[in-house]
Amino acid sequence: MMILSGLLQTASAQETKKEEKFRKNTVHINITNPLIFGSGSIVLGYERLLKSKKHSFSINIGLTSFPDFGLIENDSLKHLAKLKDQKGFNVSADYRFYLLKENKHPAPRGVYIGPYYSYNYFGNHNSWEIKNSNGSTAIVESEVKLNVHTIGFEFGYQFVFRDRISLDMVLLGPGVGTYDFKAGFSNNLSDAAKQKILEALDGALAEKFPGYGIIVNEEEFKRKGSTDRTTIGYRYMVQLGFRF
């Protein structure tokens, strides 16, 4: 009996030790945003496994920005420079339910579903040379702001390698988004001059910004310099992580 009691105590101690070593935390770095928006987009994340060991919450925060417009030039307008004070950030959060019946391994490894919320702000300053109808030229600065709120439901999968390294993929994340998009100018411009710059901005963003034609009413933006729309939203993300 004494031997059996000793074995039970040893087994219990080992289980407790395993429990203590269970890794509840993961830090992530988003590798999707830099591919879409450029190297200035750096978003970090943190995931915490809850006591149930089948649910977790995660938060992400970081810097982002509009993609580089590249060269824009025609007979009456020339894009001179992207100014230094580029602004943009991302904040998001989700609550994950790991599907134990679908997964061979404990969370946070395997299939998960859950709700999410994200907020993105993009700010962009540019300098332009515009040619007037009388042949004179003027230097104009423009500012573009985009605020995006999205709420939705996601489906994803997280791989774990060698107990420490994770690859987290939000594969499907449909939702509803509100998009507030505005442009402003440093000078008092004629309607024709504004129209030229707005058309150039619209064309550049349509080419460089994913989903631009869906989230922005382009005709309204080119006419008024602003647009506010509620429409479909989406979340897709790949992250590399380290568990501890």
Language model regions located:
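Outer-membrane beta-barrel "beta-signal"
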Residues: 92, 96, 230-244
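Short loop/turn motifs that connect adjacent beta-strands in outer-membrane beta-barrel proteins
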Residues: 15-24, 51-56, 100-110, 161-167
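Bacterial Sec-dependent N-terminal signal peptides
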Residues: 1-17, 240-244
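Extracellular/periplasm-exposed beta-strand and loop segments of Gram-negative cell-envelope proteins
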Residues: 30-34, 66-90, 120-148, 176-231, ...
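Transmembrane beta-strands of outer-membrane beta-barrel proteins
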Residues: 25-29, 55-61, 91, 109-117, ...
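Transmembrane beta-strand segments that form the barrel wall of outer-membrane beta-barrel proteins
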Residues: 21-42, 56-64
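Transmembrane beta-barrel domains of bacterial outer-membrane proteins
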Residues: 22-25, 30-34, 45-48, 146-147, ...
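Residue-level signature of outer-membrane beta-barrel architecture
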Residues: 48-50, 63, 97-99, 157-159, ...
